[in-house]
Amino acid sequence: MINSKKLLNFLEKKDVKFYTGVPDSVLKNFTNLLSQKNSHILASNEGSAVSIGIGYYLANKKMPCIYMQNSGLANAINPLVSIAHKGVYSIPLLLIIGWRGSPGFKDEPQHLIKGKITKNLLKLLGIRFAVIQRDRDFNKISKLINYSKTKKIPVACLIKNNTIFPVSKKNKKKNFISKDSILRIDVLREVLKNIKSKTKLISTTGYTSRELYQLRKEEKFKKGKDFYMIGGMGHSSSVAFGVSTNKSNQVVCLDGDGSMLMHLGSLHTIGNMNKNNFKHILINNQSHESVGGQKINFIRTNLE
């Protein structure tokens, strides 16, 4: 097991003091500590996180730490290969990757697929990596950091599920929603009560899809035309928009704030088409709830 505070202290002793990334349930006990630091930036997607880290290095000539789930590694490939690669600008980066679907670990189907190919993907990208499972593996991290700084290339730490110690009680996640807010499951219940029977619902990853399925099953709502986005975070609106190209379908996208932020450009495409059979409902709880509850500063953004 890894003590999250010891990990953070170790990285800072190695002069890694800037952190950015996208929340992950495997890393939540580590990233919950990061959320208390001024030198931490929550990115909208993994490619942006890598790009922020690259910019930090260009400005300060110091190695940044970029965290993500392995399912988001694909989002990061473009800047990793097109900017940070040793054949381009040669930028040292430390990637900390939550390894969902690691071999021998029971997980959801979408994670098993990515988990199986994660090591090979890193090898294909030319990124040296190590699997970190306990505090005494910090020497592996040290070697990776030294190698990255010497060769000026990205390196990665793979961390399996149930590896990082829980944070202490004083650091437990907070509820960022006011007492006047409504619960997500109540929003979903009202949607089910008010849509027509043939309406197709496309629900985003995480608790939204789980609770929609739960409501259908437990509260005896009529079986619907639902598509649950168990993976592909940030793409629910585009999938729903694609479904709406069949004009006979009434389509509702049930999205979350963290998901929508990942690929905001999709809203421009969808909005320009002005389709009458497409509705986009955003459930804004100002946090990445299903992967650790990290706060999203969406309260300052006008969504209307």
Can you describe what each PLM-predicted range is?
Residues 7-10, 17-18, 123-172, 304:
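Structural signature of the thiamine diphosphate
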Residues 28-43:
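Short acidic, glycine/proline-enriched helix-loop-strand junctions
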Residues 24-26, 100-101, 159-165, 205-209, ...:
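Glycine-rich beta-alpha junction loops
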Residues 20-24, 41-51, 67-73, 205, ...:
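Active-site nucleophile and cofactor-binding loops and adjacent substrate-binding regions
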Residues 63-65, 92-94, 152-156, 198-200, ...:
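Residue-level preference for the first positions of well-ordered beta-strands
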Residues 25, 39, 83, 90-98, ...:
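Thiamine diphosphate
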Residues 3-14, 171-236:
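Active-site diphosphate/adenylate-binding microenvironment
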